[in-house]
Amino acid sequence: MKKHIRTFLAVMLAMTMFNACSSNENFDENGKIANAFEQRRNLVGGNYFDIFGELDGLRLQAMQFMYAYMPLPDIADYPAEYHLQNVDYALKARAEMPWGKTVPVREFLHFVVPVRVNNENMDTSRAVFYNELKERVRNLSMHDAVLEINHWCHEKVTYTPSDIRTSSPLATVRTAYGRCGEESTFTVAALRAMGIPARQVYTPRWAHTDNNHAWVEAWVDGEWHFLGACEPEPVLDLAWFNAPASRGMLMHTNVFGGYDGPEEVLSVTPCYTEINVTANYAPVVTTNVKIVDKDGNPVKATVEFKIYNYAEFYSAATKESNENGETSITCGHGDMIVWASKDGKFGFTKFTAGKDCDVTVVLDKEPGYTATLEMNITPPKERNTIPAVTAEQAGENARRYACEDSIRNAYVATFPTDAYATELAAELGLDNATVATLFKQSRGNYATMVDFLRACPADAKEKAMRLLFCISEKDRRDVSLDVLNDHIVAALESDNNTDWFYNFVVNPRVSNEMITPYRSFFKSVILADDVMKYKANPELWVEWCRNNIKVADTWNPLSLCMSPKGVWEMRVADTHSRDIFFVSAARAMGIPARVDEVTNKTQYLCDGMWVDVNFEALESNNAPQGKVKASFVPSAFIDNPKYYSHFSISKIVDGRLQLLNYPEDATWESLLKDGSALDTGDYFMMTGTRMADGGVLAHLTFFTVEEGKENRLQYVLRESNERLQVIGDFNSENLFYDTTEQRERSLLSATGRGYYIIALVAPGSEPTNHFLRDVMPYKDEFEKWEQKMVLLFRDTNEAERFVNDFPELPSTVVWGTDINDNIYNEIVANMKLKNPNRPIILVADTFNRVVFMSQGYSIGLGEQLVKVIKQLSE
């Protein structure tokens, strides 16, 4: 925070000018903001509000607006001077940008002033972005400025998947890539920095495929328009997800504060208003829902609207029914599950939006409920609308796209090379391969790694490396030097080299929080005698937390992670931050502790056993457990179903589903073949087969786990002989060498979004010749389909030996070579192939789903493929 405090006085001087220009404006004509602020100040107390005595005018009103609705972690972890600097830059943009005064007060307060976009770690990006972008967009229209800012964003960042913690905008820039949630957070931050109202829109889960997505909406001259973050197009309302979004069941955004815009309100919290924007992308319809008990009496209950995705019923929206048991949802035209619960009882049903106008849910399921059910789920159909783009616009955008790639790649080229890693490893006496991996993963944060390792004593460098690989890969991209220096002390002060010591004492990461240098802080505020007492009996530390930390989930509805130091100082936190605080302080005292990744239970290690922490009871006790096993008969393509792809298990707690978060590589074999221990209680296992059209054949099993007993289930994976179904997965981000363009590129970049055909072929082989000749008669059909057919040889030698005697192949063919057999090896592993025979042909899509596979000699492949693509087009 030192950087923004140093600039504070300079900003104050600048504000003197443009506050005068804004003297006629009033952000709080009816006094609503001032009243909300006073209520919040009385609730929180402390010295967090001292700065307000120095403020007046629009600065005061904007700061009151922020603090009236700000989640607790943002009050506790960021000084008031930080929030004031961001307010000042918002007012500066409003005064200096040509569109500034055209933005209504409502849109300015809710979509420009707040620096927080989602759950990211906040930083000083607003000032940085404003100063970098102001001259670039000053003379543009608001419309063109939005497009230009997205081009600038693409110069800085491109897509790559990563974990759930959202990097700050500046960390994303330093890394030069991010997942969609980070790209959209970054782009919204850039737009808001320039005084353009912007919001992050997301579909929590697609209905037609196992994934989700986030993008950006910008307010331009009175209307909201969408764009793909860091994916510039020649016009607004155009992105690769136009078609998928038209199949969306629900798309929404969280708006800071008490927003009263025209959109449907899904929920209102003390900090934000959740609104429904699905109608911006897909045809929608409203379904009315009534919740009743077994006698038909209306019930005021919790109502969750769920979408099948990642083999679970995911809650896309949660509402409360009124005194008459009524609520409603506006969503796309497809199947959704409505799940209601009250006092441990629950009920659910599937409804088809657009067909079922009124739905009744009966709360007739009670603890101990067991059953097996089948359910067919149908997503919305595609209704794609694409805005017009001229050939000139597309060509210019492609030219700029390539230029922006080169700018970003030039920056990435400054990251350490393997040669530098070898040199540094020799200097520090460390393993060369490990240092090279560290540099590749730390990317733009590599200098922090170098400074940290060089500063460590020679006999402690291996300990330093262990710390660096305890934290997550994303941590290595944005962790600060003071954090590393703070936490290495635990390793330096101990001779313990066990994995549990490094993972659960030295490791600063507990859950999904931004890691901070809390260890030295706790050593300074917790008395040494108390540390000895807590280490001897960790239940005393549980008791201290129970008695001293007030839980207030209401004021942190997004479950942002308050820093452990912030929790100690405020003595108020949400449940999740309280749990992280407990573990962090315990580790600082040398007590092994964790938040279990599967069950989310807070635990400490005692006599080699993990003890469940119970902050409500007087003493912590481990829950009794039983065992669950499931038998499974392998299918032709699936012999070991994957968790999240083919099945999931949730515990039913107070009538609601709580997913067990097993590792991403968990399977039936690792969890259920020989059985897993589960806490006693009620459970729900979902298995599902995703069809090529996005539909799902689901099987639902409700079961109980009793103490000391084994429950044996039947794992049922439904199949269809009539419809194409998803039979495997294949990464569309895989690289190949394009022999026409003579460069490496991803399959996704070559094929574009949607389905495509990929074939691994062998020059001169009879099966490959048959395949290519079978394709030629259907040249017109493949070209009408317009999707790519990627034909890959094993290497350059094979490509050079190939004699192209197949003149009538479709023009959509892309020729290339595999790189180090990477694509071949993945297909063999994922599709369970028993031999290396080529050709190997897949029909897959860029959501990584495989719906057709053929290997080796086969006659009539051209006709088979045409039948497949026709089904995909229906």
Q: Which positions does each model-derived feature cover?
A:
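Short, internal strand/loop/helix patches
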Residues: 804-838
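Short Pro-Gly-centered beta-turn/loop motif in secreted/extracellular proteins
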Residues: 221, 322-338, 342-345, 351-357, ...
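Short active-site neighborhood of thiol/selenol oxidoreductases, capturing the structured segment around
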Residues: 746-775, 788-792
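Secondary-structure boundary elements
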Residues: 25, 31-175, 211, 395, ...
